[in-house]
């Protein structure tokens, strides 16, 4: 039949053919605009198939044109029969259905790739999937099968990455490239569908069974309209005349009588699945504005509201949102303000819960207070912890970190008001407020001031006292003593030391020592550290306290260096700086160790323990101080070992020795570039007696500018280098002098004659120098024969090594022949193992006696001609 004589049913086929033509043109345009290079081959295949299909359609339309009127009657009848048979058996699919079939096929290919762990296949199919879903977003709706596929693929990718961290087996190169490609693309892609993905992960069955499709964001938006900024007051005015309804469509009314019921429902739903926390916060903010509201209701609403805000920072969230933190800080300040005004309402931990939501509680007979269950100190601690987490996550080199750090002032005011409130509660013994609560809040206050300079602490205290009324005062830290930071730290530390035990007591002591060392009170801080005996028990404390101990130890060492006590500074810093793990021990960074198996949980805990940047101790300055002290001690010691074998094995700093040996092995040494190079070249100059050159190298280190009183420190270092240069010179050249005038040494090292005499006298009294000081002629008279020559010292070295070789061989032989009765006997009964008497053949000399004792000093190589030469 001709198409001009068809009935009304043909309109559907015409519309479907028009859809196919539009689909073909849209496909061709999109394929021309495709940007992914990896899919060029696939697109070319699709274009070829589209061209073939379009050519078939054109041929069909031509046949349906003029040529079909030239057909015979028989042909037309046969064709009508074939068409009727095809219509009875063939199901015509629309273009949209075809696209859905292609989408499902691609998803199944991705699932097959997941089963065989073929990430190259997954990467290609994932790109193809994203191109296909663009064509299906006609009404800005993403198919649920697509949402399910990308969510499952992201979970599978995270599992694969986690397995790769803990398993030593690596992927091949192709698979690894595919995994990296998927990791880069899927995170960027899934951000556009995060709402649908979250809904799917909360309840997959409900998401897939729901009728309405979740709207997906448009991939390409040509025109963007920005929503006008609406203030809170304007939004409230716009909402007038409207009522809030619940999920069942009933109007929700917030009245003073229903506040406790709403709070009960919110508290019971906390922690449950699919709970909208932001909606709960909005409800409680509305309850907080209900008028009239009693103090009890206000306290209950604020407690629940603050806890709900903290829930936003719990779980997998990196940190609490900034606006919620500031809102929680304001709510906590409002809570403390209410408790300060309403003296008959108290928040204590041991109070009973009020169960009757239909009526308000009253003060029981015979009591003065209405007790509300809760803990103010726990809220303050959580607020403090959230600020620390936020500072850990912010880049410290940005202005955002400085802006966030300003919130510490308002937090300190809240801690101070909380301390005043707990002091008020402790006055009444009937409330039975535990001492531990007061200790915890004092410890938080101490944690915020112990590492700050006295001027900053003074400003914090002044601002805190301005926030409270003029009549308010503290028994622990009176208002009259708020101007002296040293007294404040001393009072807080002594209070905790007397009224607490365990970790809090140890932390209080360490905070006081840190503050004293920071303000150049070296001898006080050293005596407190020694009398506390914390170095003996610190291993039994938690990791946070051990970190504080390490920080305090470093600060004491830096204080000793500023005082010019080089030996004390080096000994104090040796434990931390000699390990090479300063970052880890001071909680200022995570050390990436080779071949270490660190679980994700351990890595997360390690990052949580890191200190915020403003609390860090400069590691470059610390290394510079340690290496400088080691140089001033090691260079004279190395010069002394050249002529005195008794001190040969004494090493003050192994770290410094390794650096010095590595520097000496360098064929060419360029100008110093960093702190370590400056110290190494200064060491080389000092060992050669060029103390002026060594001083110039040390003074040119720019890190000294970070220390207070920079010029005083440089002057102190110059004097130390002069004295140690004098000692090094005497150790090196003593064997070549008979007498040496004090005036000569004074002019060489530009030291006062009295200072030179004092240094020489100290060396003689410590038996470091075999000489005598003639005060009449002001000369140093050296004794000959005491110091060994170079040949004698080398001969002793050879004898020591030969002796140790013999002992090692004998021990090895005894271990190999252990248990054998006649291990050392020979056929002619001459054996080295028969030590009960007799002679040893062929080993030079005889040994008599049953079991002769070894000579002291370890140099007992006495056999053969070499032994006789050494003895002679």
UniProtKB/Swiss-Prot annotation:
Residues 613-787 form the PCI domain. Residues 831-848 have a biased composition (Gly residues). SMART domains: PINT. It holds the Pfam family PCI. Keywords: Cytoplasm, Initiation factor, Protein biosynthesis. One of its GO terms (molecular function) is RNA binding. Residues 88-100 have a biased composition (Basic and acidic residues). GO terms for cellular component: eukaryotic 43S preinitiation complex; eukaryotic 48S preinitiation complex; eukaryotic translation initiation factor 3 complex; eukaryotic translation initiation factor 3 complex, eIF3e; eukaryotic translation initiation factor 3 complex, eIF3m. Its main location: cytoplasm. Residues 1-100, 812-872 are annotated as: Disordered. GO terms for biological process: formation of cytoplasmic translation initiation complex; translational initiation. It is found in: Cytoplasm. PROSITE patterns: PCI. Residues 16-59, 72-87 have a biased composition (Acidic residues). The keyword Protein biosynthesis applies. Belongs to the eIF-3 subunit C family. Component of the eukaryotic translation initiation factor 3 (eIF-3) complex, which is involved in protein synthesis of a specialized repertoire of mRNAs and, together with other initiation factors, stimulates binding of mRNA and methionyl-tRNAi to the 40S ribosome. The eIF-3 complex specifically targets and initiates translation of a subset of mRNAs involved in cell proliferation. Component of the eukaryotic translation initiation factor 3 (eIF-3) complex. This is Eukaryotic translation initiation factor 3 subunit C. It comes from Neurospora crassa (strain ATCC 24698 / 74-OR23-1A / CBS 708.71 / DSM 1257 / FGSC 987). The lineage of its organism: Eukaryota, Fungi, Dikarya, Ascomycota, Pezizomycotina. The gene is nip-1.
């Amino acid at each position: 039949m001709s198409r001009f004589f068809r009935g009304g049913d043909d309109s559907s086929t015409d519309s479907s053919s028009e859809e196919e033509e539009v689909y073909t043109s849209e496909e061709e345009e999109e394929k021309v605009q495709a940007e992914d290079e990896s899919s060029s081959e696939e697109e070319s295949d699709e274009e070829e198939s589209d061209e073939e299909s379009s050519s078939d359609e054109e041929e069909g339309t031509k046949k349906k044109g003029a040529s079909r009127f030239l057909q015979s009657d028989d042909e037309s009848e046969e064709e009508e029969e074939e068409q009727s048979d095809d219509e009875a058996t063939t199901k015509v699919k629309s273009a949209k259905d075809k696209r859905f079939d292609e989408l499902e096929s691609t998803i199944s290919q991705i699932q097959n790739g997941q089963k065989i762990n073929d990430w190259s296949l997954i990467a290609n199919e994932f790109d193809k999937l994203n191109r296909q879903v663009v064509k299906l977003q006609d009404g800005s709706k993403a198919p649920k099968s697509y949402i399910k596929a990308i969510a499952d693929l992201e979970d599978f990718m995270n599992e694969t990455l986690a397995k790769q961290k803990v398993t030593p087996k690596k992927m091949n190169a192709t698979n690894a490239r595919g995994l990296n490609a998927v990791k880069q693309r899927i995170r960027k892609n899934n951000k556009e569908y995060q709402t649908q993905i979250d809904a799917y992960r909360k309840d997959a069955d409900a998401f897939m069974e729901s009728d309405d499709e979740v709207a997906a964001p448009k991939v390409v938006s040509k025109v963007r309209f920005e929503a006008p900024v609406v203030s809170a007051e304007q939004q409230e005015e716009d909402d007038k005349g409207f009522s809030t309804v619940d999920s069942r469509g009933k109007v929700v009314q917030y009245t003073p009588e229903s506040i406790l019921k709403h709070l009960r429902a919110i508290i019971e739903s906390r922690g449950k699945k699919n709970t909208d926390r932001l909606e709960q916060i909005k409800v409680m903010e509305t309850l907080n504005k209900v008028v009239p509201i009693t103090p009890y209701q206000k306290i209950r609403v604020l407690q629940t509201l603050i806890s709900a805000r903290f829930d936003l920072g719990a779980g997998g969230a990196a940190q609490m949102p900034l606006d919620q933190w500031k809102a929680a800080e304001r709510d906590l300040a409002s809570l403390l303000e209410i408790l300060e005004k309403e003296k008959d309402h108290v928040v204590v931990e041991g109070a009973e819960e009020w169960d009757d939501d239909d009526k308000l509680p009253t003060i029981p007979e015979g009591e003065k207070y209405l007790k509300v269950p809760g803990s103010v100190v726990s809220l303050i601690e959580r607020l403090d912890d959230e600020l620390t987490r936020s500072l850990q996550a912010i880049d410290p080199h940005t202005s955002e970190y400085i802006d966030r750090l300003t919130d510490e002032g308002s937090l300190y005011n809240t801690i101070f008001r909380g301390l005043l409130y707990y002091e008020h509660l402790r006055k009444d013994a009937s409330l039975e407020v535990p001492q531990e609560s007061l200790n915890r809040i004092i410890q938080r206050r101490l944690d915020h001031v112990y590492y700050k300079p006295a001027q900053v602490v003074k400003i914090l205290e002044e601002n805190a006292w301005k926030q409270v009324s003029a009549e308010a005062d503290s028994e622990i830290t009176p208002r009259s003593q708020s101007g002296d930071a040293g007294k404040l730290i001393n009072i807080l530390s002594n209070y905790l030391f007397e009224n607490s035990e365990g970790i809090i007591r140890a932390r209080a002591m360490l905070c006081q020592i840190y503050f004293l060392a920071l303000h150049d009170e070296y001898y006080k801080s050293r005596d407190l550290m020694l009398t506390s005996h914390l170095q003996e028990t610190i291993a039994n404390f938690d990791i946070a306290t051990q970190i504080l101990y390490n920080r305090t130890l470093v600060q004491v060492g830096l204080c000793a260096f500023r005082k010019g006590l080089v030996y004390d500074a080096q000994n104090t810093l040796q434990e931390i700086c000699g390990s090479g793990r300063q970052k880890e021990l001071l909680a200022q960074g995570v050390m990436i160790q080779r071949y270490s198996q660190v679980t994700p949980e351990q890595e997360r805990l390690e990052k949580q323990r890191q200190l915020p940047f403003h609390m860090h101790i400069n590691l470059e300055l610390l290394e510079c101080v340690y290496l400088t002290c080691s140089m001033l001690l090691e260079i004279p010691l190395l010069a002394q070992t050249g002529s005195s074998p008794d001190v040969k094995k004494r090493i003050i700093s192994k770290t410094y020795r390794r650096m010095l040996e590595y520097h000496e092995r360098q064929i060419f040494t360029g100008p110093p570039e960093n702190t370590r190079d400056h110290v190494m070249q200064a060491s080389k100059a000092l060992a050669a007696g060029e103390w002026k050159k060594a001083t110039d190298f040390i003074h040119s280190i720019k890190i000294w500018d970070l220390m207070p009183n920079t010029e005083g420190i440089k002057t102190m270092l110059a004097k130390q280098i002069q004295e140690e240069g004098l000692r090094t010179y005497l150790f090196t050249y003593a064997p070549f002098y008979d007498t040496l005038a004090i005036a000569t040494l004074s002019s060489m090292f530009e030291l006062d004659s009295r200072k030179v005499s004092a240094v020489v006298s100290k060396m003689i009294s410590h038996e470091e120098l075999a000489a005598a000081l003639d005060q009449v002629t002001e000369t140093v008279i050296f004794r000959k024969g005491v110091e060994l020559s170079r040949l004698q010292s080398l001969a002793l070295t050879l004898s020591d090594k030969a002796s140790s070789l013999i002992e090692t061989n004998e021990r090895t032989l005894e271990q190999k022949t252990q248990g054998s009765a006649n291990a050392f006997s020979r056929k002619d009964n001459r054996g080295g193992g028969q030590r009960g008497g007799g002679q040893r053949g062929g080993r030079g000399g005889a040994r008599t006696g049953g079991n002769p004792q070894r000579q002291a000093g370890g140099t007992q190589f006495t056999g053969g001609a070499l032994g006789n030469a050494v003895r002679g």
